[in-house]
């Protein structure tokens, strides 16, 4: 009976160690994802409208560790209606060195919070928004991301090419 007890203890320790290792790996992936996202000059925002995906290049703001992403846009742009009708979005970021990427999936909402609008404003946008009241924010709560980074040896599956996926709490 004693050998069985020790086997159970060893298995329990291995499971705990494996779970801890996975948590550490996920945290490392999150750190690297933020590095790629925040170094990317532009991103590609994809919305869905009438069963068709529409993508456009966007100038995003830095993402904080809470994995909330903001974009500024014109209140009259098509993407605002797309998001109101279907808040599920995908955003793609290429690494600065072009040796990896992060693709996020999340839920978008529209924010007209004046403090946030002031915070997420670039002076060079004055020429695009002569009437600043047309400026609004898209807030994306990131739910998950896929990541590839040659620099950090994060690669897809050798057979399926499926990249690692990380869920955000």
PLM feature spans:
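N-terminal leader/targeting segments and the immediate start of mature chains
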Residues: 22-42
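Bacterial Sec-dependent N-terminal signal peptides
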Residues: 1-24
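A mature extracytoplasmic/lumenal domain signature
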Residues: 49, 73-75, 95, 108, ...
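A short mixed-secondary-structure module that forms the rim of ligand-binding clefts
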Residues: 61-96
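General beta-strand recognition
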Residues: 44, 68-70, 146
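Charged, gly/pro-rich active-site loop segments
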Residues: 23-24, 102-169
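A short, Trp-centered hydrophobic/proline-enriched beta-strand micro-motif
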Residues: 35-50, 89-93
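Hydrophobic/aromatic beta-strand elements that line small-molecule binding cavities or substrate pockets
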Residues: 58-62, 106-108
């Amino acid at each position: 009976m004693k050998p069985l007890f020790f086997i159970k203890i060893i298995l329990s320790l291995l499971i705990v160690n494996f779970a801890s290792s996975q948590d550490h790996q996920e945290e490392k992936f999150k750190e690297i994802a933020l590095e790629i996202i925040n170094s990317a000059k532009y991103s590609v925002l994809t919305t869905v409208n009438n069963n068709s995906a529409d993508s456009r290049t966007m100038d995003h703001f830095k993402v904080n560790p809470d994995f909330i992403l903001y974009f500024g846009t014109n209140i009259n742009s098509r993407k605002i209606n797309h998001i109101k009708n279907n808040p599920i979005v995908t955003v793609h970021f290429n690494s600065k060195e072009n040796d990896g990427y992060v693709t996020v999936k999340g839920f978008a909402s529209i924010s007209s919070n004046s403090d946030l609008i002031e915070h997420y404003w670039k002076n060079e946008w004055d020429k695009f928004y002569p009437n600043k009241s047309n400026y609004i924010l898209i807030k994306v709560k990131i739910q998950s991301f896929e990541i590839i980074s040659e620099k950090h040896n994060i690669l897809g599956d050798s057979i399926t090419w499926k990249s690692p996926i990380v869920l955000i709490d």
